[in-house]
Structure formats: C-alpha cells, structure tokens
Amino acid sequence: MPTTATKLKSKPKARPRRPALPPRHPRRTRDEHAQEIAQDYVEIIAELIAATGEARVIDIARRLGVTHVTVARTIQRLQRDGLVTSLPYRSIFLTESGSKLSEESRTRHEIVVQFLESLGVPDRVAQSDAEGIEHHVSKETLQAFRKHLGRRK
C-alpha cells in the first residue's frame, strides 16, 4: 500500500493534447473586423434613410452607442472605400456599392434570425444574437441555413 509520501510524488496523469489551431494572422483579423464595422454602418445608414430620409452622424452614433468622432472617422474610411458619400455637415448617403453591401448584410441578418427562431430562440434574443453571428457565417453555412428554412415551409 503506497504511503502518503509516495502519493504526493506520483505524477499527475497527462491530459490528451488538443489539436493545434491554425494560426490567426493579425492583418486578416483586422480586415475581418473592419468589414464587420462597414457592414454594420451601411445597414444602419440604409435603415435611417428608409425611416427618416437621411442618415446623420449623430443618429448613427446614437444607434451604435459611440461618439460622433468615432462615426466621423469610420465614415471617412467608408468614403475612401467607396461605400458612402457625404458633404461636410450634411447627411450621409450610400453609393451603389454601399447599397449592395447593405442589402447583402440585411439579407444575411434575416436568414440568421429566421434560423435561430426555427430552433426555438425567442425573437428578441435571435435579433441580438444574429448581430454577432451574421458576420462570421460562411457562405456554405448560410446556404445550409436557407436549406433548413426551406424544408420547414
């Protein structure tokens, strides 16, 4: 029978090794995050234009819970990327590219929400969760969501 001293000296069982995750490249991560932000902004701009006829920096800031300075900087980047147009102290408008991205983002969001609701997730929660999920779903997964939703009808 082992003594207490030998029990303390015994080595703990080795845990099985987890497979190594593929490396994440910081530049890729930054680019993906920038794309998420662009999608959120063009979606909000489209919603504001549809609801009030214009999208102002202050309205976007309120919707996102950020400062007007943050919005102004992001709008400059979106202008550089050809997604929005604006004049100083004027409303912000979507370009053709911005409108297309907005529509794609809105459709993606709706599919994710419908999929979550089909699993029994309440609407309020599905809307909130979709905001985080929609940017990270591959085209293949989105197509699988559509297929699943089509079978339910």
Task: For every predicted segment, state its role.
Residues M1-R18, S128-K153:
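C-terminal regulatory/oligomerization modules of transcriptional regulators
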Residues R24, R28-V66:
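N-terminal helix-turn-helix DNA-binding core of bacterial DNA-binding proteins
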Residues I37-D40, R56, S97, R108, ...:
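N-terminal positioning helix adjacent to the helix-turn-helix/winged-helix DNA-binding module
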Residues I44, T74-R77, L83, S97, ...:
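Residue-level recognition of specific faces of alpha-helices
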Residues A55-I92:
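Canonical helix-turn-helix DNA-binding module
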Residues R90-H109:
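Basic, amphipathic "hinge/linker" alpha-helix immediately C-terminal to the N-terminal HTH DNA-binding motif
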Residues S105-E140:
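Arg/Lys-rich, alpha-helical DNA-contact motif
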